[in-house]
């Protein structure tokens, strides 16, 4: 399982109930490491009508709270996994990964604390939060910059985002509760892990009509009962 899958998706929080959905576009830059070139990933997030979707070029994760459904969609292989909420990711893992996943989740520690710093990022007034994580003996340090100056109910999003955290980061309730200490929506973050620097920046927050069938697997995609090892490498 790629540990950096953790990195790209550490910023989720709430949904507005509007005729148009909330659209958020973010850019994550990862420095070169272990012979791998630097990466620049664009991620789109959509929130609306009790539905949450996060989309990259290769994958989509959809949470439909009204129908209590979860979808993880692999656009490369044109396959998807469907599950009911509340989500237990270990039940969807390949057998050889389930035990390892459970051990990682149980052994993970996280601490979130306000650091007293403020910063103006684009049009947003933000406050800083220091986040420290340890997973399998690997320390990760992050700084999140969160703002309440957003055109949606960030408190509502924070209360709805737990299942999406679990799906993207493969974590449990303790992790979710700790991240609720962040007041506002994180519009930027800086992270360092094993000498690798990762930065995330929000470049757009707006209201848009979502694409057709955004919150469901595309027609013609094949349903799978569990993730394959290939999915864990995404």
Residue ranges of model-derived segments:
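Extended soluble regions of mature proteins
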Residues: 20-234
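Bacterial N-terminal signal peptides
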Residues: 7-16
